[in-house]
């Protein structure tokens, strides 16, 4: 690996002042021996000058975990809750999440994201999420980057990404007009389904030329965009960089 990670122009490596502004929730929470949440709280309190004990107590009512129980005896979902509890109590400027809700039940997932979004709204916290769950990201992120083999293949606002690709379902007896950029095409009965790249208004105008009896333009989910734009073993970069 190579390169340098910077936050606000400052290198992160061996920079305690910058690291104190960052909290990370890993895929698996590391704890030594019989360490408890209370032990970890004391540890975090010394690492993070802005650690908020009042916030810690408030979140304790939400997560309702036993502070005196060894973390290694918690289930994965309970360990994940403990990680959120500790990290959010640090009042970080930057919150880094790795597969953040893996192991949590649907109710707790919603609760956790609600807490994170409240911090974003109230404190301006920037959240960086690494996840394979695109459906989850679509609900909480406003900017998306897709990496493959360590390279950033696509980085764009979610709105811009969704504006650039459209699903069309239509019924027509005439051939499709020229000038359409078709990423995928299928047919079930008389209904054709097209995945098209381009502006929705331009696509609608072109499809109108074949006088369809039915024509619906639908937004795609982030997962669908990923499949149609980056599908295939090697992810054809030429299809997404323009």
What are these regions (language model features)?
Residues 106-108:
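Helix N-cap at the start of a conserved alpha-helix in ABC-type nucleotide-binding domains
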Residues 26-82:
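ABC-family P-loop ATPase nucleotide-binding domains
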Residues 95-99:
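Catalytic Walker B motif of ABC-type/P-loop ATPase nucleotide-binding domains
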């Amino acid at each position: 690996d190579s390169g340098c990670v910077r936050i606000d122009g400052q290198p992160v490596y061996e920079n305690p002042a910058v690291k104190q502004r960052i909290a990370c929730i890993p895929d698996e929470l590391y704890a030594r021996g019989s360490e408890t949440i209370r032990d970890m709280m004391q540890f975090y309190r010394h690492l993070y000058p802005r650690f908020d004990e009042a916030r810690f107590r408030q979140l304790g009512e939400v997560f309702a975990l036993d502070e005196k129980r060894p973390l290694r005896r918690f289930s994965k979902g309970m360990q994940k809750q403990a990680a959120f509890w500790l990290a959010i109590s640090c009042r970080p400027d930057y919150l880094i999440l790795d597969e953040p809700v893996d192991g949590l039940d649907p109710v707790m997932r919603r609760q956790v994201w609600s807490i994170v979004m409240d911090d974003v709204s109230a404190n301006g916290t920037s959240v960086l999420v690494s996840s394979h769950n695109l459906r989850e990201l679509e609900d909480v992120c406003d900017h998306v980057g897709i990496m493959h083999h360590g390279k950033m293949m696509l980085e764009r606002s979610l709105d811009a990404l969704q504006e650039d690709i459209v699903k069309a379902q239509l019924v027509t007896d005439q051939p499709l007009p020229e000038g359409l950029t078709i990423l995928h095409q299928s047919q079930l009965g008389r209904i054709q389904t097209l995945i098209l790249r381009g502006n929705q208004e331009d696509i609608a105008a072109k499809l109108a030329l074949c006088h369809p009896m039915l024509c619906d333009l639908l937004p795609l989910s982030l997962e669908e965009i990923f499949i149609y734009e980056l599908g295939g073993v090697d992810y054809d970069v030429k299809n997404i960089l323009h």
